[in-house]
Amino acid sequence: MSAPGPYQAAAGPSVMPTAPPTYEETVGVNSYYPTPPAPQPGPATGLITGPDGKGMNPPSYYTQPVPVPNANAIAVQTVYVQQPISFYDRPIQMCCPSCNKMIVTQLSYNAGALTWLSCGSLCLLGCVAGCCFIPFCVDALQDVDHYCPNCKALLGTYKRL
């Protein structure tokens, strides 16, 4: 039993794993904060002795701060997001994107998938003598197009199926 088995690890120097370098160390990215400006040369600080030998404070000189040019200027842009408008089978009030006026939409009914499906269903039921065309006369079975009354632009469509 003195021979080590294949499942035993060979004894040797153990190496402790170290933490990987940080992102800044790896990529060489500086911090996002600008470096402070270099100090301006000014008067020496300390006490100045007067003629009577007593210490007095030096006169204070104020220098105006020098603006640091920012190479990474941030431009602010305001974005207006308009919610999508849901069209239904009745007129809606909205601002027309073409003429930019507040309008109430005009409706136009067109044969759509539900109209043709209803016609085919009536035809299969035996309404061949013209009764199968009734869905083309019923607005509740047709698709609805919304138009601007001012510029006549198509604003949207409500599809029933």
From Swiss-Prot:
Subcellular location: Cytoplasm; Nucleus; Lysosome membrane; Early endosome membrane
Region entry Membrane-binding amphipathic helix, spans: 111-134
A GO cellular component annotation in the UniProt record: cytoplasmic side of plasma membrane
Record: residues binding Zn(2+): C96, C99, C148, C151
Induction description: By estrogen in vagina, cervix, uterus and kidney.
The entry's keywords: Cell membrane, Cytoplasm, DNA-binding, Endosome, Golgi apparatus, Lysosome, Membrane, Metal-binding, Nucleus, Transcription, Transcription regulation, Zinc
Start and end residues of each LITAF domain: 76-160
Highest taxon in the source lineage: Eukaryota
Post-translation changes: Phosphorylated on tyrosine residues in response to EGF.
Residue positions of motif PPxY motif: 20-23
GO biological process: one example: regulation of cytokine production
Chief location: cytoplasm
Membrane-topology annotation of the record: Peripheral membrane protein
Any one GO molecular function term: WW domain binding
Domain notes: The PPxY motif mediates interaction with WWOX and NEDD4.
Name this protein carries in UniProt: Lipopolysaccharide-induced tumor necrosis factor-alpha factor homolog
UniProt gene name: Litaf
